[in-house]
Amino acid sequence: TILQLYNFDAIVVEPAGALSMSALDDYKDKIKGKNVVCIVSGSNNDITRMEEIKERSLLYEGLKHYFIVRFPQRAGALQNFVSNVLGPHDDITYFEYRKKTQREKGPAVIGIELQHPEDFKGLLTRMEEQGIKYIYLNDNPNLFEFLV
């Protein structure tokens, strides 16, 4: 909601100020056909926090997903991932890789932004079809905060 207000209406609000609008999604069936007023308040928000707010919003909406992926340590491994795993509108927004010596595979932390939440299942299916082993970080808050 905060991002929508900012992106579409150039309104900067603090998280508490957008709470009433966020609640509309949860109550949409109960308030259908009724007149509803939402009070949007507070611009007590540091604009430098917008990136953090955007990140949390994308995670909440199911549009951003983080993984630890074990990549083969050979030329073209990332290109293979991009070509055969990512959908046409998927985007790698975070990538951290460390080459390991004397090993066939090395771990990479990857952040992938999807255009629609329903694209997630297809992403996982393509990873499995390509034999890619991964750890999903969004459901593991301790590891997520440590790595991302």
Tell where the protein language model's regions lie, with residue ranges:
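Conserved residues at beta->alpha junctions
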Residues: 15, 40-41, 72, 114
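A short, charged, Gly/Pro-tolerant segment at domain boundaries
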Residues: 18-19, 38-44, 142-146
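Active-site-adjacent helical/loop segments in soluble small-molecule enzymes
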Residues: 1-34
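A conserved regulatory-domain signal marking ACT and ACT-like small-molecule sensing domains
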Residues: 47-148
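Catalytic phosphate/nucleotide-handling subdomain of diverse soluble enzymes
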Residues: 25-55
